C-alpha cells in the first residue's frame, strides 16, 4: 500500500471517473457529493456508507470555442457503456489502485442500472486489468480483486470467473517441443507464438514498458481450449508456460480507456545494464528515469479518447532532463489536474512528488492545479488542503492554466502558478543569458587536499586563492570562507589522476577565473541569495557564477539588484523549484537591461553594508578589529554603541531592498502578485546579540593572549612565519603559548 489511499482515490476519480461523467453528466447526482456532503467529508464527519467521489476536481471554466470542441469529444464518451471500459494498472503492486478502480466501476454500473451481481461479473471479466513484474505482488493484487468481488457478491467464487491480473512472465526458457505441439503446424499460430516469444524475451527485466504486437487472440485461446482434454506429453507444459505468455502479451498489446499507476522510480545510474539499454533504445528522449518511460508508454497504451493518471516525482515538471517529456505531454495530451506536494510530504519516498491526470489527446483547454508546497505536516495536511481547494477555488493555492502558456518560458517548465502578465514578460523580454555568461565552477575531485578554509593556511601563501563555494543564505556579500590550490594555474589539480590515469578534477569555467561577477549557492532549500564576486577568486562546483559579457561592474550590480529582489525569488522557483539550481535556470530569467538604469548605486551600497557586517567577525579574512573595542569605559556602553550600529545597518539595508523591490515590481508589472515589503528574517546582515557577541569577544581576547590578534595591529597579527614582538606593545602575547585555566586570578 505504497500509494496513500486518498491519492489513489484522486487518481482514479479524475481519470476513469472523469471519462465517465463527461459522457454521462446525468450520473453526477449519484456519483458526486453535494456541497453539504463534501463539507461534512472535509470536516471529518464521514458516513461509512458514503461512496461518492470526494476527490473529483470539476473541470476549469473554458473559453466558448474550447467548450464546443469538448462537446464533440464528450459525444464519444456518451456512446460508451460500462462493459466497454477497459482499465489497467500496469504496475499494480498489491492491487491498491485496482481495488479502488473496482469500487468506481461499481458506482458506474449502478448508475447505469446494472444489478450488483451483473456488475461484479462484468468488471472482472471485461473491465479490470493488472500487471506487475513481481510474482508475489501480482498474487496479492489478484487476491485483492477477488476479495473486492467477493465483497459485492458473496457467491462470486462459485462463478468461475478469473481476474485479468498477471505477473509478467518472460519467454527465455520456453519449451520448444511445447510450442511445436501447441502450434500444431498452423502457420498463423506459429507466427503469433514466435512473435510473442521474441517480444517477451527478458520481460522480467523490462516490465510493462514492453511494446507487444497485437495478435488474433481468439485463435490462440481457442487452441488452448482445444488442447485442454488432449492426451499429450507436452499438453501440461503448454498450458503452464504458454498460456501465461499469451495472457500477458494480450494485456500489454491492448489499448485502454484509462491507465492509472504509481510507476517505479529509478534513475539511469541505478538501472541494470539490460534495462538501461532497453530504455535508451526505446525511450531515448525519456531515459532520465524509469518513471518517465512509464508515463510515455502508458500514453501509448491508452486510447486517444482515454485518460492516464500517475503518482510520480515532480522533477519532470521543471528540470531540463525532462523537457522532452514535458513537450510530449503539452503537444499530445491535455493535463486535466495536477497536485504538487510539499517537498518532504511523502515520507515513504526519498523524492518530492506530484500526482496528475491527463486526457490522451491535445485540447487547448485550462487544467486545474493545486500548489501545496507551503503546507508542511505530511500527507494528512496535504489531503486536508486538497479537500479545501476542491471546495473553495479562491483558497490561494488553486490555479487554472493552459499548458500552451508554458512554452513561453525557456525550458517549458510546468509553471502553472505564473500570472498571464508574467507569461507575457517571458515572451517579450530578453533573458539574462543574452547579456551574461553563467557557469558552474570546478570540481577538485579531492576537496580534502585542494580546498581549505582560509584560516588553515599561512598568511602569505602563493599556493592558495580565494574560492567561491556556496554556503548559507546570505545576500550581497559574504560566504568568503574557502581557498583553492591554484598555484601555477592549477598545476596540481590538473595533474592529479586516479589509478586508471584519469584526471580527478573537472575544470569547468576556468576561462572565467579571476573575473568579477556574481555568485550564488547552487543548492538552496529556501530563497535564492546572490553575492558579489571579486576579481581575485575562483568558483567551485557548489556555486553558479554569473559574469557580465560587458565586463562592466555596473552591469554586475544591476543584475545583483534584480536577482536579490522579490522578482528574482519569484521567477527562479518558476523555472526550477527544486533545491538544485543550474546555470540554465538563471540564464532563462527575463530581463530588460535598458530599464535597469537606477539600481546599481543601491546595489553597491547594499554590498558595502553587507561587507561591513561580514568583516565584523573573525570568520572574515578581512577582519580588522573586534567591534566591541571602542573608546568607552565599560563593555555595556560598547555593546550599546554596537547595537545602534547594527540596527542602523539592518534598517538601511532593509529600506534599500524594499526600494529595489518597488522599482522591479513596476518594471515587471507584477503589482498584483508581489509586494515590496521585506521581512526581517530575509535581511541577511546581523543584529547585535548580547550572548553571541560576548562569546565572540572572549574568543577575540583569547586570540590576543596567544598573539593571533593585537590591539596595535589591524587584522591578523600572526599567522605563521617570523614572530614580531613589536606588534604587541599595548598587550603582550603569552611567551610560551601556554595559559593555565584555574581558579586563581590570571591578571595580578
Predicted ranges, named:
Residues 1-79, 426-459, 463-467, 473-484, ...:
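Class I S-adenosyl-L-methionine
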Residues 142-144, 152-256, 331-336, 344-502, ...:
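Polynucleotide-recognition surfaces of large bacterial nucleic-acid defense/processing enzymes
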Residues 3-337, 361-368, 373-378, 384-390:
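SAM-dependent methyltransferase catalytic region
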Residues 1-2, 279-290, 316-317, 344-346, ...:
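Short, contiguous acidic/charged loop-to-helix segments that flank catalytic cores in large enzymes
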Residues 362-363, 521-588, 595-609:
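Basic, amphipathic alpha-helical recognition segments used for DNA target recognition
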Residues 87, 247-261, 463, 481, ...:
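Carboxylate/His-rich catalytic cores and anion/metal-binding grooves
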Residues 92-95, 135, 172, 264-266, ...:
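Short, glycine-/Ser/Thr-/acidic-enriched flexible segments
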Residues 89-91, 98, 130, 258-260, ...:
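Structured core elements
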